[in-house]
Amino acid sequence: MELNELQQQRLAKLERLRAAGIDPYPPRAQRTHTIGEVLAGFDQLMDRGEQVTVAGRIVGARRVLGKLAFAHIEDESGRIQLWLSRGDLGDEWFDRFRDDLDTFDIVEASGTLRRTQRGEPSVFVTRMGVLAKSLNPPPEKWHGLSDIEERHRQRYLDLIVNPEVRDVFRTRATIVRTMRRFLDERGFLEVETPTLQPIYGGASARPFITHHNQLKQDLYLRIAVELYLKRLIVGGFERVYEISKVFRNEGVDRTHNPEFTMMECYQAYADYHDMMRLVEDLYRALALEVTGSTTIVFQGQTIDFGPAWRRVSIPAAIAERTGIDILELTELEPLQEAIRAAGLKVDLKPGWGRQVDELFSVYVQPALIQPTFVLDHPVALSPLAKRRPDQPLLVERFEPVVAGMEIGNAFTELNDPLDQEQRFLEQGRAYDAGDDEAQQMDVDFLNALMYGMPPTGGLGIGIDRTVMLFTDQPSIREVILFPHLRPRE
């Protein structure tokens, strides 16, 4: 590895430490208190004259003023000032601090606690040690790494210099923990299903493909867990859920990452109305846990999860916004003729269902700011959902939308094996016609349905987008620790 000038200077300091018999990467630390513990009990510890040992990374500039020196160190729990005097610390380590230690080094310091004349809590250091010498200097503006792509490529550095980023991922953990507790308390059983699958299904997406050498078989990283969870409903589990990574070989943008986290749950003897109530209760619980209130602010918009969510029908909303009645234009060509005649600026899609989805995505969804259930999806887009009895072109399905962003998907699940077989055959014809996101025939899943699956409601929630909402982040990359990026050129 070729080192630049600043790295070489730091390497020389490391070698001086080693030459003096000091291990710059010792195996153990002597820490007695976190910085947060010291700050929380500062006055009591100070009054007792208790010796503490803290450890952390040197942040900010070090100051050396004759026989005194100052630095701040930071651990995950907080930041505190170190006060070093040549008399208390001794010549050797005072000189080492001055000459051989740098910003970003990880150190430990022992001493008693006092406040400075300005009232700042400080450790008056009597012993010091190096725990990890940093060979990389901080970025130019160490207090804030601002290049967005570099922040995502070097998330470790982003977490060092932008402490607020750590708060995003603490909130993410709170959301996942709260979601688990919410489902557990309602009698759902957490399960695990295969990541490598012989047939991909449960969503309309392109898969990632790998190969099992021993079995001489192509396998797919899962694009959803739906079909396995519904097999469990057939098997007699009445409420199941899984929180897992799923993988879709698709583009990367503000709300999409090829690897993302989903929560899927299924409830026997329920339908999509039950799933709506579950979603309303879940997001109210998340808001209260994260913010203490049912309201949040996302990108300047105040969102209220307290009231019942609005219901919006796709055909009615498209008619209101564009003047096109999709239920009167149930073939692709007449629908696209109407789009052209109306001068609507949307991409022309292969398939009536996809064209309806495009109209809704462009002309309706961006305006849905408050929590909304989007209902009445075309059956062509929903091969796993039960048809509406009164309108066979549509299904019992909803997508929860908040701040113009789809955050999930839910159905009354299709449990008729004969209807499901016909849907799979239609998907196969679409695939043969060039739709590479069409779903595949899954004979084993059909066999499971033939044993009988009770009426079932199913729900999938995008955890990454949910975290975006509750942390007010504009991009999915900000809520994934290590998002996928293009290779460096």
From Swiss-Prot:
Domain of life: Bacteria
InterPro entries: Aa-tRNA-synt_II, aa-tRNA-synth_II, aa-tRNA-synth_II/BPL/LPL, Lys-tRNA-ligase_II, Lys-tRNA-ligase_II_N, Lys-tRNA-synth_II_C, NA-bd_OB-fold, NA-bd_OB_tRNA
Keywords assigned: Aminoacyl-tRNA synthetase, ATP-binding, Cytoplasm, Ligase, Magnesium, Metal-binding, Nucleotide-binding, Protein biosynthesis
GO molecular function: ATP binding; lysine-tRNA ligase activity; magnesium ion binding; tRNA binding
Keyword Protein biosynthesis applies: yes
Protein residues bound to Mg(2+) 2: E406
Gene3D superfamilies: Bira Bifunctional Protein, Domain 2, Nucleic acid-binding proteins
GO BP: lysyl-tRNA aminoacylation
Cited PROSITE patterns: AA_TRNA_LIGASE_II
Annotated catalysed reactions: tRNA(Lys) + L-lysine + ATP = L-lysyl-tRNA(Lys) + AMP + diphosphate
Principal subcellular localisation of the protein: cytoplasm
EC code(s) of this entry: 6.1.1.6
Entry's cofactor comment: Binds 3 Mg(2+) ions per subunit.
Cofactor(s) for this UniProt protein: Mg(2+)
Compartmental location: Cytoplasm
Residues reported in the UniProt entry to bind Mg(2+) 1: E399, E406
Transcription regulation among keywords: no
GO (cellular component) term, any one: cytosol
Pfam assignment, any one: tRNA-synt_2
The protein's assembly and partners: Homodimer.
HAMAP family: Lys_tRNA_synth_class2 (MF_00252)
UniProt family annotation: Belongs to the class-II aminoacyl-tRNA synthetase family.
Protein known as: Lysine--tRNA ligase
Species the sequence originates in: Roseiflexus castenholzii (strain DSM 13941 / HLO8)
This protein's encoding gene: lysS
